[in-house]
């Protein structure tokens, strides 16, 4: 199995720290609003990675955090006349509701930043003691000048990174030794949530949170760290700097970054105002369709969010569902053909989780199933791919029985050449969104 490592910009053979086990950390949301489709891309992409690793037999310890203390949370809580805890818990609950609907497997743990404040203070103090960090009027900053290969993850020089960071480095530069230095601890402001630390009351900076939660729960070195491509700098760059300064060990063996969801050629983001929340979208779009749309493009590639793309996803799901509905578990099949499908799917996915190539194999498999191939082994592989994709079909047995009865009545009408009755039943089914197919093996049906 190979993974594209952002740090080296190369495909690398995947060798976990402990054979058969994977330690994986994915940056989660800052919980001040509903997640939008762009946020969901990262959640779904790494859910697919996790599920494929499990399919391949790995035991995955999967950690994804909630940032529940932040300027946006503080401001949102004030505007809503709520505590920061109640405000963030509202959107944590919404996150679970949205991601459950998208059939995302719950993380092994979803730590909250506020649960690790003491550990963050200890982490920062150690950096101060080692002179990797310094105190300035109650704030604590990391000395970037002491970090070896600081800009390597983003594959740029430091000057370029600072120029392209879209204001994210815009802190109180007058308190810093260098404009490149970043905050580990921010001194308390009036009417803001704060904690007591050796340098005075305050709260942690954004970057320290993930380093502390990752090393606390997974250890000093982990296998995979994932997140959106926009996190390469400064967030992941700073995570590496502060973590390796503290531990003296390599922080992450494989860095993975997903591509953006684009709208009219621009990244979907709250700052641009061109976003659609998952909460809103699921009022009008089946969660399966959104899941399929997000899951079936290779994770490193951008995806364009359009009505046509959702329609294409819906049509493809219908084809897959139709094949799955009519799969005969009692049928006999050429198992060597099934083995070829399975091996080809694994070969595609083993190349940096290339689901786009994997889907080409899967669509060929679906066509093969539609030709009458079935049996328990065929159903097992079908189920395994659906699990990786995060698709679950729920067939309403009572409704299915009613449809089958109408189909049988239509067949009897055809046998006695009562074509008017036959057409009447067909039209009645079509009005319910049921399309009939007359095949040499009998009548099959699927939903429009």
Swiss-Prot record:
Catalyzed reaction equations: tRNA(Cys) + L-cysteine + ATP = L-cysteinyl-tRNA(Cys) + AMP + diphosphate
Binding-site positions, ATP: 270
InterPro entries: Cys-tRNA-ligase, Cys-tRNA-synt_Ia_DALR, Cys-tRNA/MSH_ligase, CysS_C, Rossmann-like_a/b/a_fold, tRNA-synt_1_cat_dom, tRNAsynth_Ia_anticodon-bd
Keyword Cell membrane: no
Enzyme Commission number(s) from the entry: 6.1.1.16
Motif mapping: 'KMSKS' region: 267-271
Main location, first listed in the record: cytoplasm
Highest taxon listed in the record's lineage: Bacteria
GO molecular function, one term: cysteine-tRNA ligase activity
Keywords: Aminoacyl-tRNA synthetase, ATP-binding, Cytoplasm, Ligase, Metal-binding, Nucleotide-binding, Protein biosynthesis, Zinc
Segments carrying motif 'HIGH' region: 29-39
GO cellular component: cell surface; cytosol
Any Pfam family matching the protein: CysS_C
Positions annotated to bind Zn(2+): 27, 210, 235, 239
Cofactor(s) needed: Zn(2+)
Record note on quaternary structure: Monomer.
Family: Belongs to the class-I aminoacyl-tRNA synthetase family.
Name this protein carries in UniProt: Cysteine--tRNA ligase
Source organism of this protein record: Lactococcus lactis subsp. lactis (strain IL1403) (Streptococcus lactis)
Lineage of producing organism: Bacteria, Bacillati, Bacillota, Bacilli, Lactobacillales
Gene of this entry: cysS
């Amino acid at each position: 199995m190979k993974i594209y490592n952002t740090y080296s910009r190369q495909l690398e053979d995947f060798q976990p720290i402990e054979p058969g086990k994977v330690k994986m950390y994915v940056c989660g949301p800052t919980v001040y609003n509903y997640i939008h489709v762009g946020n969901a891309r990262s959640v779904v992409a790494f859910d697919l990675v996790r599920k494929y690793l499990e399919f391949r037999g790995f035991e995955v310890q999967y950690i994804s955090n909630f940032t529940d203390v932040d300027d946006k949370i503080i401001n949102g809580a004030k505007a809503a006349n709520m505590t920061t805890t109640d405000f963030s818990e509202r959107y944590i609950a919404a996150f679970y509701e949205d991601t459950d609907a998208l059939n995302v497997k719950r993380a092994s743990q979803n730590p909250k930043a506020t649960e690790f404040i003491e550990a963050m203070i200890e982490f920062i103090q150690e950096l101060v003691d080692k002179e990797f960090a310094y105190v300035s009027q109650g704030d604590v900053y990391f000395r970037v000048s002491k970090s070896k290969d600081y800009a390597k993850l983003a594959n740029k020089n430091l000057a370029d990174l600072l120029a392209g960071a879209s204001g994210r480095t815009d802190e109180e530069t007058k308190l810093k030794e260098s404009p490149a230095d970043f905050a580990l601890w921010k001194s308390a402001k009036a009417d803001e949530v704060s904690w007591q630390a050796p340098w005075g009351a305050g709260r942690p900076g954004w970057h320290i949170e993930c380093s502390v939660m990752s090393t606390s729960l997974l250890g000093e070195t982990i296998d995979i760290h994932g997140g959106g491509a926009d996190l390469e700098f400064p967030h992941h760059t700073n995570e590496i700097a502060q973590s390796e300064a503290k531990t003296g060990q390599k922080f992450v063996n494989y860095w993975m970054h997903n591509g953006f969801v684009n709208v009219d050629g621009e990244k979907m983001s709250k700052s641009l105002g061109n976003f659609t929340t998952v909460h809103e979208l699921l009022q009008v779009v089946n969660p399966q369709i959104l899941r399929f749309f997000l899951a079936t493009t290779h994770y490193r590639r951008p995806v364009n969010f359009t009505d046509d793309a959702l329609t294409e996803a819906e049509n493809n799901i219908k084809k897959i569902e139709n094949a799955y509905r009519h799969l005969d578990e009692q049928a006999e099949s050429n198992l060597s053909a099934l083995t070829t499908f399975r091996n080809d799917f694994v070969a595609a996915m083993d190349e940096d989780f290339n689901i786009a190539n994997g889907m080409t194999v899967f669509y060929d498999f679906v066509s093969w199933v539609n030709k009458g191939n079935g049996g328990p082994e065929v159903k097992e592989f079908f189920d395994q791919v659906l699990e990786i994709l995060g698709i679950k079909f729920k067939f309403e047995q009572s409704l299915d029985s009613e449809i089958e009865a109408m189909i049988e009545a239509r067949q009897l009408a055809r046998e006695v050449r009562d074509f008017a009755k036959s057409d009447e039943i067909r039209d009645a089914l079509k009005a319910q969104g049921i399309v009939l197919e007359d095949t040499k093996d009998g009548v099959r049906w699927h939903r429009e």
